[in-house]
Amino acid sequence: MRNIGIIINKEKDKENKILNLVILKVKEYLNPDEIKVIDQFYKGDYKDLMSLDLLIVLGGDGTLLGVARKFSTVIDTPILGINIGNLGFLVTAEISELDEALYRIKVGDYKVEERMLLSCTIEGVTCSDERALNDIVVARGTLSRMAQYEVFINDELYATFKGDGVIISTPVGSTAYSFSAGGPLIMPNLQIVSIVPICPHTPNSRPMIIDGNNKVRVKPLINESDVFVTIDGQKALKLEKHNEVLIKKAKEFFRIISFDNKSYFKVLRKKLFKIE
């Protein structure tokens, strides 16, 4: 691999000790022509990133979600996620496994898996086209009253309910907010979407699984409530009356490196269920 990029969450490595260690190990195992350290809030020319053969992301799940949201539309470089955060459910390896991970990449003992992304557009809002690796949430504000939501699938009304909101989740996001709201766990390689009401006040409002090629439209009936759309829990936009949120599978994918010894169910047991 000739060109390697590194993105690090500086809040978790203020003295650059981890960054310097990773640079040293990358040189030792992969011997690249160039190592480019990229700020996680990068605002430069994305063309500079298109030549990367590998992008190493140092942080936790939040850092990885931010990278997916910001860079997925401009580069399709395979990503090696190294956890230096807390949960680290989405990452490829822990920082303690750095040597093993880089060695596996060196000898070609790895896979590049594609993860589905969601595209979110808000009708009536300029430049609202966003990407989400986990979920898109349409929900009331903290101090708002319960709101009413209409959910359409391919322009056909699916449900109308009152509640706190609705989560539109990818398979990757099924272990996040959707899981806490009673949604199902979904294997991350599938191309499906879950629709999960949040605290619905209607007994028959239940989670729904649909094929990823379907389009979802959420129409909040805004009266006295403030309603927001939140992308991966990181970016929020307030909706105005008559705004509708259009959600569909993005044409891009999030490409992440995986190893055979890190099965989905093994990670589930360890990270989510706390079973070794």
Swiss-Prot record:
Its cofactor is a divalent metal cation. The gene is nadK. The active site is at 61 (proton acceptor). This is NAD kinase. One of its GO terms (biological process) is NADP biosynthetic process. Signal peptide: none annotated. It is found in: Cytoplasm. It comes from Clostridium perfringens (strain SM101 / Type A). Its EC number is 2.7.1.23. NAD(+) binds at residues 61-62, 134-135, 145, 162, 164, 172, 175-180, 234.
